[in-house]
Structures are given as structure tokens and as C-alpha cells.
């Protein structure tokens, strides 16, 4: 798992190049402001986020909103869903409402220049998540895995032990299925007026 002291080590995976460097530069900027101006900035490094108000643009959204939108539209139009890769890569997912709770927790419990990994460190395969979203959305068509498209890095585990040492507990995370269900209820309420569609 990626520990906080490894954030700047080596080149990021090509599939995550820009995003990884952006996280690194935010850490540099946070430390510089802390050092030069005495700002109590911290660098909280999340993993894969999802939830209401996410970006549902199929060209640049994260995996959960992309799958959720594809399955919703396929269900409505009675079509199959094509997903990239083979579905085997493992990812950690954190609900946006959990992220908000963690950030409030950090305001009271963390004031250090070193970055801190935040987010649920339980791993799920993309296939598991897709099947869960299919059940939640009521999608009954076929999920076609396009193995000619990239699957991405197989794993991107993060070490959340520093957050745990501060008192955050695994039980403080909302259940993935419940969080996906809440998110889909929001999608139904807002569709088609979702960010990335309109």
C-alpha cells in the first residue's frame, strides 16, 4: 500500500499520470504556504471518490459515475453496457459524505505538514462494483467487457494507518452498497440534469 512518504517517489503509472502529479503539486503548494506564511494547511490525499454531484461525463468521469450513467441509460433504452478492460483491477472507493466527515475530523485532529491518506481502504474489483451497480439500477442487460481497451493499473492500494491512529475507524465508513444506492437515488432525481451531461 502507498504510504504518505511514498507520494513523491517514482513516476506515476501512465494511466494516472496527470492526476497523480496534480496531487503531488498540491502537497508542495500546501507545504510552501505553511512554511512561508504560517498557514495551517494540510494535504489530505483521498482515493477514488463518488457520490451525489459527481461528474457524469463519459469522457472524463471517474469509474463509478461512468458505470452508473451507462447502466441507467442502458436500462432506459434496453441496451447492453460496454465497460473497458476485463473488470479485474482493484480499487478503493470512498463516498463523498464520508470524505466530508473525514475532513471535519481532520480539522480537529490533524495539523502536520506531512500528507495524510484518507478514504476507505477496502478494495473491490471493478467487476464487483459494476455488478453491484447493475443490481441497484435494475439493469438486466449484458455487461460486455471490452478487453481491447485498457484496464488500468491493477491495484492502487493506500495505507490509511495514520488516519486510524488519529481515531478514525473502519466502521465510520458507510457501506458501499448503501452509498451507491443513495447516489443512484440522487441520479434518478436529477437526471438528465447531471454535471457532465448538460
Role assignments for model-derived ranges:
Residues 1-43, 48-50, 54-59:
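Catalytic helix-loop patch of NAD(P)-dependent Rossmann-fold dehydrogenases
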Residues 73-198:
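C-terminal substrate-binding subdomain of Rossmann-fold SDR/epimerase-dehydratase oxidoreductases
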Residues 49-51, 63, 99:
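Conserved sequence/active-site signature of Rossmann-fold short-chain dehydrogenase/reductase
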Residues 30, 70, 130:
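Aromatic/hydrophobic pocket-lining residues that form π-stacking "cages" and hydrophobic walls in ligand
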Residues 59-63, 125:
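Short acidic-hydrophobic sequence patches enriched in Asp/Glu that either
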Amino acid at each position: 500500500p502507498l504510504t504518505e512518504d511514498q507520494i513523491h517517489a517514482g513516476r506515476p503509472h501512465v494511466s494516472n499520470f496527470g492526476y497523480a502529479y496534480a496531487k503531488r503539486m498540491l502537497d508542495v503548494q500546501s507545504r510552501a504556504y505553511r512554511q512561508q506564511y504560517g498557514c495551517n494547511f494540510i494535504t489530505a490525499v483521498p482515493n477514488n471518490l463518488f457520490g451525489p454531484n459527481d461528474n457524469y461525463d463519459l469522457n472524463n468521469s471517474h469509474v463509478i459515475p461512468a458505470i452508473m450513467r451507462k447502466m441507467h441509460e442502458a436500462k432506459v433504452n434496453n441496451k447492453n453496457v460496454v465497460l473497458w478492460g476485463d473488470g479485474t483491477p482493484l480499487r478503493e472507493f470512498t463516498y463523498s459524505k464520508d470524505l466530508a466527515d473525514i475532513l471535519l475530523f481532520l480539522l480537529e485532529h490533524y495539523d502536520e505538514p506531512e500528507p495524510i491518506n484518507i478514504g476507505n481502504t477496502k478494495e473491490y474489483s471493478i467487476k464487483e462494483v459494476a455488478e453491484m451497480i447493475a443490481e441497484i439500477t435494475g439493469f438486466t442487460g449484458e455487461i460486455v467487457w471490452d478487453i481491447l481497451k485498457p484496464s488500468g493499473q491493477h491495484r492502487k492500494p493506500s495505507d490509511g494507518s495514520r488516519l486510524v491512529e488519529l481515531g478514525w475507524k473502519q466502521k465510520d465508513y458507510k457501506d458501499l452498497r448503501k452509498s451507491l444506492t443513495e447516489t443512484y437515488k440522487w441520479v434518478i432525481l436529477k437526471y438528465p440534469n447531471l454535471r457532465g451531461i448538460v
